[in-house]
From Swiss-Prot:
Catalytic activity: S-sulfanyl-L-cysteinyl-[protein] + uridine(34) in tRNA + AH2 + ATP = 2-thiouridine(34) in tRNA + L-cysteinyl-[protein] + A + AMP + diphosphate + H(+)
Enzyme Commission code(s) on record: 2.8.1.13
Name of the protein: tRNA-specific 2-thiouridylase MnmA
One of the GO BP terms on file: tRNA wobble position uridine thiolation
Cystine crosslinks: 102-200
GO molecular function: ATP binding; tRNA binding; tRNA-uridine 2-sulfurtransferase activity
HAMAP family assigned to the protein according to its UniProt record, in alphabetical order: tRNA_thiouridyl_MnmA
Superkingdom: Bacteria
Organism: Halorhodospira halophila (strain DSM 244 / SL1)
Site feature Interaction with tRNA, where: 128, 345
Similarity remark: Belongs to the MnmA/TRMU family.
Length: 383
C-alpha cells in the first residue's frame, strides 16, 4: 500500500545509502527535509573521511534532490550517552558495541525528537537496511532487510519500540547493488563514494592508538593455557575475545603447532591475557550466553521458546532455546557451540525475519569446562 504524503526528515550522512533513501522518499511524493547529524567532535586530522567531507557530500545530495538541509550537533549527547559508556565497558574488560548505543540514544531518540520539535515531522528516515511491520500484538515490529549480506537489524535491536512507528527504512527491500545502481542512474553526486567502515567515532584509525588517549595502558602478562608467559599486553581494555591481530606474539618454539594465537580470556585479578592456538580452540566455544536485562521489540516469548540468535553482526543466525532469568535477563542455549561470544556485545534474537530485541551479553558459558574459572570473559557456572 502506498503511503500518503508526509513530512519526513532524512538523516543525510553524506553516504550513498542515505542519499538513495532520500531520493526514494522524494519520488514517492513526500515532503523531505535533510538533516546532517554531527555526533563526534573531530580532535585531529587523521580521519580519512572528515566531518567536512561528509557535510559537503550531504549538501551536494540535498541540492541535487532540491530539498532543504539542516545541521544539528549531537556530539555532547553522543559523548555522554554512547562514548562514556563505551569507555566504562572497556575499562571493565568488556567489548561494547557503540553503534547499537548510538542508534538507541541518538539516531532514534535525539534525532526523532529533534525532527518532531523543530520540523513538526511525521517521521524520520535513514539508510539502514532493515524493515518495519506489525507484530502479533498489533504493535510495530522490526524486520530484517531482504539482503542477508547488508541486513542491519542487529544494530537496531536496542531502538525504542515506540519509535518504530515513526521510522522509515526506504532501503529495506533492496540489495546494495541495486542501491548503487539507482544512485548512478539518478546521477547522485556521491554515487561512487566508498562505504564508511569502522566504529563511528574512530573511523579508519587504529583502535588501540585512539583509545589510549582515554584509557591509560596497564601492561601485564600474556599467558598460554598452561600458564606460561609468552609476551606482554598493553592493557586488557584493548583486546577482545577471539582477536588474532595485534598480539605481538609469533610462533611458540616449545610447541609442535605453528597455528596462530587468539585471545581466549582475561583474568582481571592477575591483569593477565590468556591466549590459545587455533581458530576453533575449545576455550573459544560457548554453549550459552546470559544477558543483562533484555530489551524486547516484540511480545516476550514463552520459556523454552525455540528461536535464532546472533552474537555479532553478519553472523549466520544460530538456533537455540530461550530461558528467562531474574530481573528481565535471559539465557540462550545454542544447539551448537558458538565461537567468541563476547561479554559487552549484544545477543540479538529473531523469530524468522522478525527481530525480537537484544541484550548485552554479561556471561559467555564455555562449552569446555576445563577453561579457568578466573577468566573474566567467560563463566564456568552451570546453566
Amino acid at each position: 500500500m502506498t503511503e500518503s504524503p508526509k513530512r519526513i526528515v532524512v538523516g543525510l550522512s553524506g553516504g550513498v545509502d542515505s542519499a538513495v533513501a532520500a531520493l526514494r522518499l522524494v519520488r514517492a511524493g513526500h515532503e523531505v527535509i535533510g538533516l546532517f547529524m554531527k555526533n563526534w567532535e573531530d580532535d585531529d586530522t587523521l580521519t580519512q573521511c572528515s566531518a567536512e567531507d561528509d557535510i559537503a557530500a550531504a549538501v551536494a545530495v540535498a541540492e541535487h534532490l532540491g530539498i532543504p538541509i539542516r545541521r544539528v550537533n549531537f556530539a555532547a549527547h553522543y559523548r555522554r550517552e554512547v562514548f562514556e559508556h563505551a569507555l566504562q565497558e572497556l575499562r571493565a574488560g568488556r567489548t561494547p558495541n557503540p553503534d547499537i548505543l548510538c542508534n538507541r540514544h541518538v539516531k532514534f531518540d535525539r534525532f526523532l525528537r529533534h525532527a518532531r520539535e523543530q520540523f513538526e515531522a511525521d517521521a524520520v528516515a535513514t539508510g539502514h537496511y532493515a524493515r518495519t511491520g506489525r507484530a502479533g500484538d498489533g504493535e510495530p515490529a522490526l524486520l530484517r532487510g531482504i539482503d542477508p549480506s547488508k541486513d542491519q537489524s542487529y544494530f537496531l535491536a536496542g531502538v525504542p519500540r515506540q519509535a518504530l512507528d515513526a521510522v522509515r527504512f526506504p532501503l529495506g527491500d533492496s540489495t546494495k547493488e541495486t542501491v548503487r545502481a539507482e544512485a548512478r542512474s539518478a546521477a547522485l553526486p556521491n554515487f561512487d563514494r566508498p562505504d564508511s567502515t569502522g566504529i563511528c567515532f574512530i573511523g579508519e584509525r587504529d583502535f588501540t592508538q585512539f583509545m589510549q588517549r582515554y584509557i591509560d595502558p596497564h601492561p601485564g602478562p600474556i599467558l598460554t593455557e598452561d600458564g606460561r608467559e609468552i609476551g606482554r599486553h598493553c592493557g586488557l581494555a584493548f583486546y577482545t575475545l577471539g582477536q588474532r591481530r595485534g598480539l605481538g606474539i609469533g610462533g611458540d618454539r616449545n610447541r609442535d603447532s605453528s597455528a596462530p594465537w587468539y585471545v581466549a580470556g582475561k583474568d582481571a585479578r592477575r591483569n593477565a591475557l590468556f591466549v590459545v592456538q587455533g581458530h576453533d580452540h575449545p576455550w573459544l566455544q560457548s554453549a550459552a550466553v546470559s544477558t543483562e536485562p533484555f530489551h524486547w521489540l516484540a511480545p516476550v516469548p514463552a520459556e523454552g521458546a525455540r528461536l535464532h540468535a546472533q552474537v555479532r553482526y553478519r553472523q549466520e543466525p544460530q538456533a537455540g532455546q530461550l530461558s528467562h532469568a531474574e530481573g528481565g535477563r535471559v539465557v540462550f542455549r545454542f544447539d551448537e557451540p558458538q565461537r567468541a561470544a563476547t561479554p559487552g556485545q549484544h545477543l540479538v534474537l529473531y523469530d524468522r525475519e522478525q527481530c525480537l530485541g537484544g541484550g548485552v551479553i554479561d556471561t559467555a558459558h564455555p562449552a569446555d569446562r576445563s577453561a579457568p574459572p578466573a577468566l573474566q570473559t567467560q563463566s564456568t557456572e552451570v546453566v
